[in-house]
């Protein structure tokens, strides 16, 4: 579109009752735009009949990261003036070298030299400062994934399992056993079994009648904390090839977070990391054994579903799945707690929505495009203290709006200079 002479852009938002899409109307002439061409921007999101009218040089859009067309509001133009051309230059130089984990590894030495050259106040793309990406896809979560017995998820499973079993057996009465008929209800039947026996029953029924007989992705296994291995005590071979079943062989599993927790969440999930399972996951054509170089590393993660605000949190030493986007800091000048603060600021959510991706997902390649300001030692100290405070508040269930306001003011004014 921007290769043509753009006359106007009319942002109509979503004028339809049923269709869940935002729309806009544009007018362009099919010829090369003049350097001084001005574009009329009309924002009709609040009032289609009397839209807000603004004017912007077409060259602004051409000189913006991804050549994105944005509303030329006072704030957006201030962001453009400070960072537009800088970030575009960084994107043009580095994107082909950081757009995948393989590219980052291929250009490792050049990236290390670049990181070493950074100084406070410099702008860098997050993808130049971190590694990581998507994680494991098992193709059969019910078989491999369990829920810790002390979590709310475990109680949900205890309630849902009898109904799932009853619904399946109503459809497949030949699967009803004599043992089941001895009990007045499937609730009573399941209560007579140990967790290991319930897991074996559900696994067996799935093997006989199909992977999704209880619903796609349904989790039915519950494990006690004593069944979860101490990650710090695992050998490199156990991390890479699995654990003997004579020992606790479940390990923490970060499966994404539908609730959208910020700062911290102790994952309620665990994956059966036995030697047999790991061997199968590595060879199963339906599974995706990806991101394995980052398994059992602390880092940062978020769910790929973005509900208005980005929600980033500390990732404990675990296996992470395909829905849990994970990054790992590799630059001492820009540590993870600082990145955590920047991503959790309201400004970065606004920046992503305006300049990077305004859909409802926030993928790893969106994160790699974020501009990060290299902090001073004082700024770094402030963010470390604030992140620790926010994490403690999260663990205690006492999140504070004052902490978020303090964070937003600091990131917007002190870090990005948008006073």
Language model feature labels by segment:
Residues 90-91, 95, 102, 115-131, ...:
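Non-catalytic DNA-recognition/assembly elements of restriction-modification systems
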Residues 25-27, 253, 272, 301, ...:
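Structured core elements
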Residues 18, 354-355, 359, 398-405:
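Short, glycine/acidic-rich hinge or "gate" loops at secondary-structure transitions
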Residues 203-317:
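Flexible, glycine/threonine-enriched loop-and-boundary segments that flank and lead into catalytic domains
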Residues 1-234, 239, 280-282, 317-324, ...:
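Signature of N6-adenine DNA methyltransferases within the class I
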Residues 11-12, 28-29, 303-305, 373-375, ...:
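Generic beta-strand/beta-sheet core signal
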Residues 140-145, 266-269, 353-358, 419:
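Short coil/turn segments at secondary-structure boundaries
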């Amino acid at each position: 579109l921007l290769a043509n002479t753009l006359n106007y852009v009319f942002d109509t938002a979503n004028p339809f009752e049923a269709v869940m899409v935002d729309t806009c109307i544009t007018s362009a002439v099919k010829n090369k735009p003049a350097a001084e061409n001005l574009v009329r921007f009309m924002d009709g999101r609040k009032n289609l009949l009397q839209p807000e009218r603004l004017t912007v040089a077409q060259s602004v859009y051409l000189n913006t990261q991804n050549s994105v067309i944005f509303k030329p509001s006072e704030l957006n133009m201030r962001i453009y003036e400070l960072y537009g051309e800088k970030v575009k230059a960084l994107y043009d130089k580095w994107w082909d070298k950081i757009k995948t984990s393989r590219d980052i590894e291929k250009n490792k030495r050049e990236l290390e030299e670049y990181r070493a050259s950074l100084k406070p106040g410099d702008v860098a793309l997050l993808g130049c400062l971190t590694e990581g990406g998507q994680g494991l896809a098992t193709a059969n979560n019910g078989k491999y994934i369990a829920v810790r017995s002390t979590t709310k998820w475990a109680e949900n499973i205890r309630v849902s399992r009898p109904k799932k079993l009853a619904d399946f057996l109503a459809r497949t009465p030949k699967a009803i056993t004599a043992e089941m008929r001895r009990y007045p209800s499937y609730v009573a039947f399941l209560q007579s079994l140990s967790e290991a026996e319930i897991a074996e029953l559900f696994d067996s029924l799935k093997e006989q009648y199909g992977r999704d007989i209880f619903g796609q992705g349904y989790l039915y296994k519950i494990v006690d904390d004593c069944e979860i291995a101490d990650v710090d005590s695992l050998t490199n071979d156990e991390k890479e090839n699995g654990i003997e079943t004579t020992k606790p062989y479940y390990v923490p599993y970060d499966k994404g977070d539908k609730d959208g927790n910020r700062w911290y969440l102790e994952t309620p999930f665990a994956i059966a990391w036995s030697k047999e399972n790991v061997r199968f996951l590595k060879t199963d054509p339906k599974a995706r054994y990806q991101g394995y170089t980052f398994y059992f590393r602390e880092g940062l993660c978020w769910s790929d579903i973005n509900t208005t605000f980005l929600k980033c949190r500390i990732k404990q030493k675990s296996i992470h799945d395909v829905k849990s986007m994970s990054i790992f800091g590799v630059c001492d000048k820009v540590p993870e707690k600082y990145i955590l603060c920047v991503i959790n600021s309201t400004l970065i959510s606004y920046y992503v929505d305006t300049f990077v991706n305004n859909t409802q997902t926030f993928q790893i390649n969106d994160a790699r495009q974020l501009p990060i300001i290299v902090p001073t030692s004082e700024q770094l100290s402030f963010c470390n203290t604030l992140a620790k405070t926010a994490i403690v508040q999260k663990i205690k269930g006492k999140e504070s709006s004052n902490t978020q306001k303090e964070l937003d003011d600091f990131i917007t004014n002190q870090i990005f200079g948008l006073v």
